């Protein structure tokens, strides 16, 4: 059986009170519509068609390699939205999954179970349902005495008895494709909203003698539709718990999983430990046997094995195996920390490579520089890379020693085995085995204390 998917993503989402198109709001680093399309892709469909509306260019850009598109000019109901996919799917044989783009928690497993049930029962239509603790706002599943699905009644159209029903429509359906598009021709907008409801297709099919069924999924939380910021936060919390549990099952330890925020595409190796209040975002990859302490933030970075990150921020950077950083340090974009290097506290590194086993201990800025291996950078060193117009590069060779409080004014080259005395301001290249001293000479004034006003203060005697 060929499988097809229609994703409904044309809604404006006015309750989000946002300039951003509703399905583009993110849940754990991915837009809601990406979550839906990725879950649907897991069933290996022949084609996915995403229905978009005015101003949906960003949706098309994000899903360009994952979906075809249909355009709904006016948002006049889910039935009309699905009908826009007729040109792409109307003549196809097989089954079509219809799902909304604002339901990011659905899983591939649930979609597979729905298709399986649909095929086994020989249904023309199967609705995915769930038992809701509080069904307010959802369409209710109305069954006959034998348990067969008669219709779905929307909140604003239901009578008191119908609204007591707790089995709800999740907004996900599986249809015989050709019967779906034939039935859509007969859907009207005679309802309180004046819209063309996709749910009316079920009653039309049933009246035509077709078999209509329902598959009740066990986990109601998957069906959460995001219509406002409250629901967005709920979806994020649920997704975060799911992500963290998956990592724990794969051998990652979380000290406090409730406060660790990990994006959906993050990869983490086994035997890594993550403390609470840690944020890991984007396409970050973290190796095995790492330790990440509270307050750390890692974005779009690659972390090797055996790395320790202590309360530090890492953005678009790389840390090789057996390196460490922190506390309170910052790797900015294009920072590369080679194997065995040590980055201490209050260090900022930007667009610089730190060589193997090099130590940058504390209170240092390294920008636009290449440092070799086995170098010691003293406390308070500054790599001065900007003249107000352009940025310049500094090179420091292997086995060099940069004394505390030094300033290296780019562009300069410091050769291998060079020594820079503390508190020097270096403006010229330093040769191999050379020592550079660039500071004022010390002068001692004998007995100068007694010339100071403080010398007459008894507390200072």
Curated annotation (Swiss-Prot):
Gene3D superfamilies for this protein:
Hexapeptide repeat proteins, Spore Coat Polysaccharide Biosynthesis Protein SpsA, Chain A
InterPro entries per record: Bifunctional_GlmU, GlmU-like, GlmU_C_LbH, Hexapep, Hexapep_transf_CS, NTP_transferase_dom, Nucleotide-diphossugar_trans, Trimer_LpxA-like_sf
Query: Among its keywords, does the record have Secreted?
Result: no
Keyword vocabulary terms for this entry = Acyltransferase, Cell shape, Cell wall biogenesis/degradation, Cytoplasm, Magnesium, Metal-binding, Multifunctional enzyme, Nucleotidyltransferase, Peptidoglycan synthesis, Repeat, Transferase
Q: Recite the UniProt cofactor note for this protein.
A: Binds 1 Mg(2+) ion per subunit.
**Active-site residue numbers:** 362
UniProt record, GO biological process: cell morphogenesis; cell wall organization; lipid A biosynthetic process; peptidoglycan biosynthetic process; regulation of cell shape; UDP-N-acetylglucosamine biosynthetic process
**This protein's pathway:** Nucleotide-sugar biosynthesis; UDP-N-acetyl-alpha-D-glucosamine biosynthesis; N-acetyl-alpha-D-glucosamine 1-phosphate from alpha-D-glucosamine 6-phosphate (route II): step 2/2; Nucleotide-sugar biosynthesis; UDP-N-acetyl-alpha-D-glucosamine biosynthesis; UDP-N-acetyl-alpha-D-glucosamine from N-acetyl-alpha-D-glucosamine 1-phosphate: step 1/1; Bacterial outer membrane biogenesis; LPS lipid A biosynthesis
Q: Give compartment(s).
A: Cytoplasm
Give the start-end ranges of region Linker.
230-250
CDD domains found in the cross-reference section: GT2_GlmU_N_bac, LbH_GlmU_C
- Is the keyword Ribonucleoprotein assigned to this protein? no
GO MF, any single term: UDP-N-acetylglucosamine diphosphorylase activity
Catalytic reactions on record: alpha-D-glucosamine 1-phosphate + acetyl-CoA = N-acetyl-alpha-D-glucosamine 1-phosphate + CoA + H(+); N-acetyl-alpha-D-glucosamine 1-phosphate + UTP + H(+) = UDP-N-acetyl-alpha-D-glucosamine + diphosphate
The EC number(s) attached to this protein equal 2.7.7.23, 2.3.1.157
- Cofactor(s) listed: Mg(2+)
Going by the record, the broad EC class of this enzyme is: transferase
What's this protein's family per the entry?
Answer: In the N-terminal section; belongs to the N-acetylglucosamine-1-phosphate uridyltransferase family. In the C-terminal section; belongs to the transferase hexapeptide repeat family.
Q: How does it assemble?
A: Homotrimer.
Physiological role = Catalyzes the last two sequential reactions in the de novo biosynthetic pathway for UDP-N-acetylglucosamine (UDP-GlcNAc). The C-terminal domain catalyzes the transfer of acetyl group from acetyl coenzyme A to glucosamine-1-phosphate (GlcN-1-P) to produce N-acetylglucosamine-1-phosphate (GlcNAc-1-P), which is converted into UDP-GlcNAc by the transfer of uridine 5-monophosphate (from uridine 5-triphosphate), a reaction catalyzed by the N-terminal domain.
Name of the protein described by the UniProt record: Bifunctional protein GlmU
Lineage start: Bacteria, Bacillati, Bacillota, Bacilli, Lactobacillales
